[in-house]
Amino acid sequence: MCGVIGLYGNTDIFRDLYQGLLAIQHRGQDSAGIITYDGRFHTKKGNGLVQDIFTPESVLRLKGSIGIGHTRYPTIGGGQ
């Protein structure tokens, strides 16, 4: 299972994607990621909870007014 959020706007949308992922995360979550676009794609993903994956440095790299975020919850198998 997973949770997905997508946004399109006129300004950088990282913070809104981040807040959305915080709202849909679950204690069983094992990974998350965000990709944004500003003419180039910018990606950050990792294992763990949303607040552990996205550091203040992530904000500087994930520029763009289009983006998708996801969280993953294992239903079978590992987090690989």
Annotate each PLM feature.
Residues M1-Q80:
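N-terminal glutamine amidotransferase
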